[in-house]
Amino acid sequence: MPEEPEKTADDKRSHLPWIEKYRPVKFKEIVGNEDTVARLSVFATQGNAPNIIIAGPPGVGKTTTIQCLARILLGDSYKEAVLELNASNERGIDVVRNKIKMFAQQKVTLPRGRHKIVILDEADSMTEGAQQALRRTMEIYSSTTRFALACNTSEKIIEPIQSRCAMLRFTKLSDAQVLAKLIEVAKWEKLNYTEDGLEAIVFTAQGDMRQGLNNLQSTAQGFGDITAENVFKVCDEPHPKLLEEMIHHCAANDIHKAYKILAKLWKLGYSPEDIIANIFRVCKRINIDEHLKLDFIREIGITHMKIIDGINSLLQLTALLAKLCIAAEKH
């Protein structure tokens, strides 16, 4: 049999998921959170970075930013001087005692003022016992090793670890920032896209760049063309156009037409959480009287709370439509 030709680096990159293919490797490539990234670039130029906790929602570049910092500080020594762990998989005390401690004890030749780096992703998933053990390890090996923790909520990190770290917070990316990156990637990949298609991806991403790129790739590979219709087929969320129509019917005090749309969404198998979350997002941007919109948002919030508490029947959503119609009647 003829030998398979050796794959070039470009061939390998073409088969990568786009979230890896377009992952930033320099600070200037990171989208959003400019002030926080600027603080980290100061650490990079000074060389002696402290222990760091970066807290923020998923898909905003927390781990990527830490990796960029490690690359600048360590250069060619990155592979042997960086330990990356996902704490949600390896959350027990044994990981700290074995993997992290052994890595901290290893001798690696680095330039003066540089340290080995332990990157802990989803650190808020670690058990309290593991965090206590980590605190001790951070203390003992502070002269040779720095720790960078990424988490969604810093409240779940124990106080002794928080007090040993510089706390940085990332916020959700704006729709404009996500859209700009999607356009850039679509041009690189030579995709056929419509404005509505990209806006649909931005709507489903909710400020999460990772989600946005995954949805873009899934739509491109599933259908080829990036249109709103194709995006919602892939992402399978309640269509915002239907929800917008439903809210307008409520604003016009027409509960029968509004309920028809709700019943259709329920029949399609969407969960109450999906329906209520998207009703809220659509209501925020819909063009209706401002005072009425505030009343609607209040009622949607109360129903959302009930659904999260577990009362997630069609009856709750139907009651919401009735309350929205009553609110509209008063205006």
From Swiss-Prot:
ATP-binding as UniProt keyword: yes
SUPFAM superfamilies with a match to the protein in the record: P-loop containing nucleoside triphosphate hydrolases, post-AAA+ oligomerization domain-like
Keywords: ATP-binding, Cell cycle, DNA replication, DNA-binding, Nucleotide-binding, Nucleus
Cellular compartments annotated: Nucleus
InterPro entries linked to this entry: AAA+_ATPase, ATPase_AAA_core, DNA_pol3_clamp-load_cplx_C, DNA_Rep/Repair_Clamp_Loader, P-loop_NTPase, Rep_factorC_C, RFC_lid
Residue positions binding ATP: 56-63
UniProt note: phenotype after gene disruption: Defects in mitotic chromosome cohesion and condensation due to aberrant checkpoint control in response to DNA replication inhibition or damage to chromosomes; premature chromosome condensation and precocious sister chromatid separation figures.
SMART domains (UniProt xref): AAA (SM00382)
Keyword rRNA-binding among record annotations: no
GO terms of biological process kind: DNA damage checkpoint signaling; DNA repair; DNA replication; DNA replication checkpoint signaling; DNA strand elongation involved in DNA replication; DNA-templated DNA replication; leading strand elongation; sister chromatid cohesion
One GO location term (cellular component): DNA replication factor C complex
Domain of life: Eukaryota
Entry GO MF terms: ATP binding; ATP hydrolysis activity; DNA binding
Function: The elongation of primed DNA templates by DNA polymerase delta and epsilon requires the action of the accessory proteins proliferating cell nuclear antigen (PCNA) and activator 1. Subunit 2 binds ATP.
Subunit note: Heteropentamer of subunits of 140/145, 40, 38, 37, and 36.5 kDa that forms a complex with PCNA in the presence of ATP.
PANTHER family (UniProt xref): REPLICATION FACTOR C / DNA POLYMERASE III GAMMA-TAU SUBUNIT, REPLICATION FACTOR C SUBUNIT 2
Sequence similarity: Belongs to the activator 1 small subunits family.
Name of the protein in its database record: Replication factor C subunit 2
Gene name of this polypeptide: RfC4
